[in-house]
Amino acid sequence: MRWYPIIGRLSDQDLTHRQLISRTRLLDRAFFKRPTLDVAPDLLGKIIVHKTDGQVVAGKIVETEAYLGNGDEAAHSARGRTQSTQVIFGPPGRAYVYLCYGMYECLNLIAEPDGQAGCVLIRALEPLAGIEQIEQRRPRAKRLRDLASGPGKLTLALGVTRARNGADVTRGELTVRELREPESFAIVQTTRIGISVSRDLPYRFYIKDNKFVSKP
């Protein structure tokens, strides 16, 4: 018998779609229409749900990074609005999916009021639903904790591609939900990783002692 993580406890099976919906509710646009540095830590503990090919997979956000529009050289929007970065300028509550190093697709969620640039990179998830499907998508993962412990890993796990770029995550097939009964946890704020500029900015957040983060 394999033990999988469930919201708030352990179980020998992962959440069904019905259980997931009954325990959570959709985030509205007002949640995202706030400063990026407020949205990034507040996304911890929220649930990303993706429905594709008749399958539902989901994971709890355990690690995020904030990227600002002004004065943040690591942000894609640092040089202004372009065809590839226009989604970052709003409206809030949409997905920004891009290809990194020509190999890995990364999922970001847009924050700030419409017209202002800001997004949150989702760095790691704790798998909650559709785990068998996730395992098929991540056959090289040797441990449950490695299924979605990184930006490129989690998009593979969720089945999210650049086809979801610009998707409204307050409705549709790719959504972000919150627990009806929120759990409590401590949050660690530290510097971002995997970038070459603006590395000293403390814009990375993760759930303390959560084993699914990419790097404590």
Features from the language model and the residues they span:
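Conserved, well-structured core segments that form or line functional sites
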Residues: G8-P216
